[in-house]
Amino acid sequence: MDIFKVLSRGIKAQPKKNQPGAPQLLPSAGAKVNPQFFHDNVGGANAKRGKKRKRKGAQANNATESGDEDDDASDVDYFAPKPTPEELAAKKDAELKADEPKKQKPKLLEENECRQILKSHRLKFTVLAGRVPQDEAATEEKPPKKQKKQKEDRKKQEEEEKKKKKKDEDKKQIYPQPLNSFGELKYTYGIHPVLADNITRQGFRVPTEVQMGSLPLQLRPEMALEKATDVEDVKVEKGIDFLGVAPTGSGKTISFLIPAIDAIIKRRAEDYTPETDEHVLQAIVVAPTRELASQIVNEGRKLAIGTGVRVVLMKRTLRLVAESNEQEETEQEAKEEVQDSDSDSEAESEPEEVMKIDEEEEEEEESDSDAEKKTESRAKGDQKFKKERPITRVDILVTTPKILLNFLCGGEKEKGKPRIIKKTLPTVQSLILDEADVLLDPIFRKQTMGIWRACTHPNLGMTCWSATMASNIEALLTKHIDKRAKRTPEQTPKPLIRLVVGLKDTAVPNITHKLIYTATEPGKLLALRQLLHPVSSADSGPPLRPPFLVFTQTIERAQALHDELKYDIPLEAGGSARVAVLHSSLPDSVRSKIMARFRSGEVWVLITTDVLARGVDFAGVNGVVNYDVPVSAAAYVHRAGRTGRAGREGGVAVTFYTKDDIPFVKSVANVIAMSEKQAGKDIDEKDTVKAAQGSVQKWLLDALPKVAKEDKRKLKVRGVESRRTGGKATITTKSSWERRRENNRREAIEASKRRKREAQKAQKEGGAAPEKAEEEWTGLD
């Protein structure tokens, strides 16, 4: 018998929600000390670490020296006067110098140690293409064994061996050196000291998984593979082509900017003469949206402070140093490129998210500043003005595909004619594709391939980055890299190395996923209002707190949802200014202001389409709401990746689905299940504790129907069809009578305008005065 229960039987227990508890972790609380997603214990030499033992003599002295930093942390003078700005600056410089280890010969890890570290962080390197075949004479040294089997069995065995050998040769796994800290970049991998100081000032200490694996291979591939065995056929003297597949928010932008800036600094130091130009275009970064391109430019300029490297965003008024291309060769290449794109697409249709991104790019180009519009209008009437426009000196160019291709082709595309590349960029030695799966999708593929063909440097390096990468995109990259290598047979082909972090095409494991059934469209609106105004703590999992993003399927639905929610936040908390909508039909200046307000915390709820689903970094977003089910598993991965950036914990991704969504929601449920498996929340129907931790349980996965291939294709192209036609799927709280009244009035006004236009047209054609029309109906009052 529990005596406490007996004595407290008549006392009402205090609710749990009022009891003080541990503070909740949120992405908006600040950066995490360790931004890494994975760190498994794989045993081996590192398994014995952490056991304390007594030390004597020199060992004790070494231990004392290594623990100085920990002792200093507890030696704090709480009554010291406030330091002056000069003292703060001197202290900061001293900390920077203290972080620099003494320059010494780099110590490389053995392959077994590299294998354990890479495995603990779930890093997998694979050589996809570019391996040099070994001499056949060396492989045929051993005499063939006598076989007493029939010819048919021998042929079958040989065919199986060839298939197995070809499969092993096509994809070979390697174990390069990992990057344990950013301090190794300066002395081990020899990056420029100014660049290393900029990295330290930006607060980078512990590398993420993608930075740990990709930076050594990109900076010094020979050193990264020095201790690796069985890599004789992987020739990296001329560099490598790289394909990085890593979770959202894992630092992919820094992973390709650091090697690009460092390579430009080194080439400038080697080739510098007083006659040469200081700024030569050597690297191009291609991104699908203008917001993402602007973000990359900002990050690049922070890293390039004091290095002399210029990072510029491409605009229509920009002039670059380019060479003219021969017309015949370009037409032939354009035809080949069109045929390759048609054959590689395999009757694939454009995903809705890509179509929206393309629409956004066109809107951005059309909605440039007034000064640029005046410049363009003057340039149309005065060809001399175009020639007098100065050439922009740039080292790294960040651009969207269409605007750069228009510059290379000399104008907009004409209908029915293939794009003719009139200019080439022979100085570009590095082409970087951010969100490569979108840029190589059918709708962007021709533009991206045109830029790729315009970069004619024989030693061009290619790097591609994304959180999702389909196998057909990898095959397309391999095919075109091999084709480009065959054009220069005198050079050793660069190997194409792929890095996969964690499980491929899965969402980030450090956030909570929720799949909520709302039955109908009005149920979605009610559920979203409950998230804005939580009334009960009965719901399992962490609550969703602002700021957060709300994704819808179409622009019309985003605008309608904004009209419904803009008065839901009380005036004391900021009112309608706390809710905003952003989509591709808004002008560029308006979108920039909304983005700035959301980053500064003025906007708490940002309603948008898939335009903001990729690449854009919002460090403090606490959650994501998929008001409409994503059109694909990849779309869900990128939407959910707007929270939980850089390892921040506490983010929430909520997905609403109705009865109409049940045939399509299984792909999203599978992604959530795989993400929870990475986080250790394995689905187990026998273990009720594990089942309670996961948001997608075993019975739900079994009950949801499988999505057919044709349904997936239709969903990518059009989304859920009922939401495009309106009707019952309209986002509104108005009654059907009110909506019918508004529609009748709108149609009556349109009919009145149409009759007036017809009357004016008849008057112009006939010349006679029109008869007096009957009194027009103006609709219901």
Curated annotation (Swiss-Prot):
ATP binds at A246, P247, T248, G249, S250, G251, K252, T253. A motif (Q motif) lies at residues 184-212. Residues 84-108, 139-173, 370-386, 736-752 have a biased composition (Basic and acidic residues). InterPro entries: DDX52/Rok1_DEADc, DEAD/DEAH_box_helicase_dom, Helic_SF1/SF2_ATP-bd_DinG/Rad3, Helicase_ATP-bd, Helicase_C-like, P-loop_NTPase. Residues 48-57 have a biased composition (Basic residues). It comes from the Eukaryota. PROSITE patterns: HELICASE_ATP_BIND_1, HELICASE_CTER, Q_MOTIF. A motif (DEAD box) lies at residues 434-437. The Q motif is unique to and characteristic of the DEAD box family of RNA helicases and controls ATP binding and hydrolysis. This is ATP-dependent RNA helicase rok1. It comes from Neurospora crassa (strain ATCC 24698 / 74-OR23-1A / CBS 708.71 / DSM 1257 / FGSC 987).
